[in-house]
Amino acid sequence: LKPSDVYETGKARFPVQTVIRPKTEQYHDFRGYAGKLSGNNIKVGDAVTVLPSLTESIVTNIHFFDQQFDEATAGSSITLELENDINVTRGDMIVKSSELPKIEKDINTTICWMDSKKLVPGAKYFVQHNTNRVLAKIDSVKNIIETDFSGTKEASQLAINEIGEVNIKL
């Protein structure tokens, strides 16, 4: 399938998998955010934004086990420390402030339907991104993509194993 022209690659994305708050005297004020960095590198000093709150901060430290680094590369499992104590929880996304994603409530996407019950407009489903889950409504089914790549055909629903373009409202 041809990737959508709004598909983003090469931008730093850090989904927070856990918040690290050691309960020891030595690290009584430590607050770190652990996860796996994707898309691009992140450096100490980078301005970052936490989604969905849009809270801003600066990366002060990057940890990997007991080592500190000035920069982390995409694919690295790391812990980030931020300049100020802000509310960051599991499932939040930390991104470079200069690389904010486009935030939408109305999404056009391609899906492969895997349920024996047909997907129809008006139906409600949960959509999950990382660990965050929201209720979404199928606004419309635009078409079915032929599996032999011969084209598309208009459709108003998707049956099991059909690939189609749909509009989803979050």
Functional labels for PLM-detected ranges:
Residues 22-170:
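C-terminal effector/interaction modules appended to NTPase cores
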Residues 1-27:
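P-loop NTPase catalytic nucleotide-binding module
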